[in-house]
């Protein structure tokens, strides 16, 4: 157990791996244990126990908040923590714990849910977490999705301060009857504990068409005092309706004097991810691996345009002849099949062309063929049909802007021309094709960029709400990790769990 800053510094200096940090206010339970267990898979884990006075308004339960240090130490050790740190108020707030000195959480993120009912609470949260991160300097920060509003606000804090820490959200851990684990559950009497189960039950009973008043009525009928029931966008935390593909249905109630919060995620379809970018940015490689990691179907739309280009060349049709290309489309049978390991088989009229479409000859003509309105309309229609139920990640040139403008996550993956030429040369060599001079490859890529971005029909463009990711100097694993981090900021583990293994 660590108490002083000197002990913390000595612990930090002896680490051989990046530190993983689990901040708590004590009263540890299995939910905290799951955070520790998951964090321990990445490196040594430091658990802090600090009951933050700035998170409590006058009249709240600061004085009686559960304090059970010996039990906390035993649980942290059982789940694999390397150390438990119990800083003093003086350590965290050397100038005093006053609301006047607190950081301000983003106003837009605390207009609703708990932020509206507990003014100043999230200011206290961001203040203490910023200080804890300053003192611990971890590589990973592990937080529960149970406190979803807090998780969103802390992600924004880390982004605003440009802190070198990766935030990991972990799904809510529940009792057998659905009640979310919470340190405050121990306030409940046996009768209240049975009554509290109505909270998760009412949330589970709701779907995208259930009026909020119905959920409120169900909670009230169970004898719970309702503070709020709201449906919000999980990222902006602003109210939304049933048209939103993924929304957060959240509630706060009082069971006796105990305040309980919970939520459920409502989905009208499975997650949809759009990854766009210029040729040679590494989209196919990372998108395949990203899709496999998250259990999503991989849709390589570029392969579809390459397949049409291959057919055009096989039939001896001039790539620039739109009418002749359109005639080929009428009899086209283009099928994509996901393969084990994240690959994709491409079939054109019953023939496997998965390798043939990667030839330099196809690469040289695909922009011309893809620019035809008839081609884009035919393939876009097929792509939209494939993505209607979600559950896939698609990569191409205009996925986020034209094909799936309602995607949960849009990424514009790019790299410099020089870096893309280097990657293209390596790819050609690995596939057994002749490799041109680097300068020639760079010229081809620059010309391809020009053609893709200036065509009339669905040009290459970064969607206004897309995240730009420049991958120069990044390993494939680093790019995939960055994509997963962006995905999890929008789609929680609770809504779309990461597949085991």
From Swiss-Prot:
Role summary: Catalyzes the condensation of pantoate with beta-alanine in an ATP-dependent reaction via a pantoyl-adenylate intermediate. Catalyzes the transfer of a phosphate group from ATP to either CMP or dCMP to form CDP or dCDP and ADP, respectively.
Region named Pantoate--beta-alanine ligase: 1-264
Documented EC number(s): 6.3.2.1, 2.7.4.25
GO cellular component terms, semicolon-separated: cytosol
Name of the protein in its database record: Bifunctional pantoate ligase/cytidylate kinase
Active site: 32 (proton donor)
Taxonomic classification: Bacteria, Bacillati, Cyanobacteriota, Cyanophyceae, Synechococcales
Single Gene Ontology MF annotation: ATP binding
Gene: panC/cmk
Database matches in Pfam families: Cytidylate_kin, Pantoate_ligase
Major localization class: cytoplasm
Localization annotation: Cytoplasm
């Amino acid at each position: 157990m660590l108490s002083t800053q000197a002990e913390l510094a000595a612990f930090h200096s002896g680490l051989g791996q990046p530190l993983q940090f689990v901040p708590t206010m004590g009263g540890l339970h299995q939910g905290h244990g799951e955070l520790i267990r998951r964090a321990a898979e990445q490196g040594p884990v430091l658990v802090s126990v600090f009951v933050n006075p700035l998170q409590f308004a006058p009249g709240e339960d600061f004085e009686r908040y559960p304090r059970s240090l010996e039990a906390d130490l035993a649980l942290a050790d059982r789940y694999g923590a390397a150390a438990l740190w119990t800083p003093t108020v003086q350590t965290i707030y050397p100038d005093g714990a006053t609301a006047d000195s607190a950081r301000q959480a983003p106003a837009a993120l605390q207009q609703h849910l708990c932020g509206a009912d507990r003014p100043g609470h999230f200011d206290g949260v961001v203040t203490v977490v910023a200080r804890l991160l300053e003192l611990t300097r971890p590589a990973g920060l592990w937080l529960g999705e149970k406190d979803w509003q807090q998780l969103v606000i802390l992600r924004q804090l880390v982004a605003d301060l440009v802190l070198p820490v990766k935030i990991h959200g972990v799904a809510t851990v529940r009792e057998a009857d659905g009640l979310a684990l919470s340190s405050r559950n121990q306030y409940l009497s046996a009768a209240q504990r049975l009554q509290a189960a109505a909270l998760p039950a009412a949330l589970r009973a709701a779907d995208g068409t259930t009026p909020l008043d119905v959920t409120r009525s169900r909670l009230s009928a169970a004898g719970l005092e309702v503070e709020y029931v709201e449906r919000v966008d999980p990222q902006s935390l602003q109210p939304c309706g049933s048209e939103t593909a993924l929304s957060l249905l959240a509630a706060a109630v009082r069971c006796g004097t105990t305040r309980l919060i919970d939520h459920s995620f409502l989905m009208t379809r499975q997650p949809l991810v759009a990854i766009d970018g210029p040729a040679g940015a590494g989209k196919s490689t990372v998108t395949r691996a990203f899709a496999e990691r998250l259990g999503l179907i991989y849709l390589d739309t570029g392969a579809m345009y390459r397949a049409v280009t291959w057919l055009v060349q096989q039939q001896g049709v001039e790539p620039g002849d739109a009418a002749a290309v359109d005639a080929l489309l009428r009899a086209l049978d283009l099928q994509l099949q996901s393969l084990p390991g994240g690959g994709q088989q491409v079939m054109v009229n019953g023939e496997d062309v998965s390798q043939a479409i990667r030839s330099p000859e196809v690469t040289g003509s695909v922009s011309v063929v893809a620019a035809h309105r008839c081609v884009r309309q035919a393939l876009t229609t097929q792509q939209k049909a494939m993505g209607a139920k979600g559950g896939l990640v698609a990569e191409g040139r205009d996925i986020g802007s034209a094909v799936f403008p309602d995607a949960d996550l849009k990424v514009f993956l790019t790299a410099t021309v020089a870096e893309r030429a280097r990657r293209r040369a390596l790819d050609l060599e690995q596939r057994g094709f002749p490799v041109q001079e680097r300068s020639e490859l760079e010229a081809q890529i620059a010309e391809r960029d020009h053609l893709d971005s200036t065509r009339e029909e669905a040009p290459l463009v970064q969607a206004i709400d897309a995240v730009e990711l420049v991958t120069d100097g990044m390993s494939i694993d680093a790019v995939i990790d960055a994509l997963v981090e962006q995905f999890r900021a929008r789609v929680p583990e609770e809504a779309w769990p990461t597949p085991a293994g």
